[in-house]
Amino acid sequence: MNEYDSGPLLLTLGLHAHQPEGNFGHVFEEHLRDVYEPFLRRATDGGLLPLTLHLSGPLLDWLETNARDYLDLIGELAAAGNLELLLAGYYEPILPSLPREDRVEQILWMKEALRGRFGVDATGLWLTERVWEPALAADLADAGVKYVLVDDRHFVASGFPRESLFAPFRTEAGGKSLGVFAIDEKLRYMIPFHPPESTAACLRGLRAEGHRLAVAADDIEKFGGWPGTRDWVYETGWLVEFMRVRKGLGEEGQV
């Protein structure tokens, strides 16, 4: 028996925040105002933590110059164990497109930036554009990565039954191994576009089927940066209701 054989479903929520190098300043400002700051502050106040978060290098640089108080909040949450920061290539490269040495170097740049700014030794990786190839495992391990988030479609395309993906996996290349977590496609498309009760029903169903781990990770920009989502998530009350439902699932022993 392992830790996933009994008890509530472990739901892991992951967020990816990115603005490309050279993007207009007003785009950074609008996303900070409409997405990054309101989501994190309301999630903190509403008890949605802990979360995992990836900040891209260009966004981290801009925030350091223009919104240090926001980074201070991230640092406080990380120090308290309420926010786990994820690695990636610093400038958001698609890792399989780079030579091996450049892959490792880009990740090490991000690792050092997170250590220097927040005092954390990040070991998980957000896979840019979720593009994977098996040879990445050895390079990620060499960069100090212990686990990576990967779309469940990669598993399905390799012949894994979808119902087997609600558990941690390990992969290996060059004699080096790496933990792999499958991002559930259904949850990724449901949150935040479906009513929270629909997501709750999905989570209850997963637990009833005997699953003990579900990973939902995607762009944070869909919580206020995509067209129509600001009103839906904040003004209409999706986020407040989602946090209420999430709390209820916890009280039921479901999640």
Question: Which residues fall in each region the model found?
Answer:
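Active-site His/acidic residue clusters
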Residues: 224-231
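Catalytic alpha-helical scaffold of carbohydrate-active enzymes acting on polysaccharides/glycoconjugates
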Residues: 1-123, 130-189, 196-211, 233-252
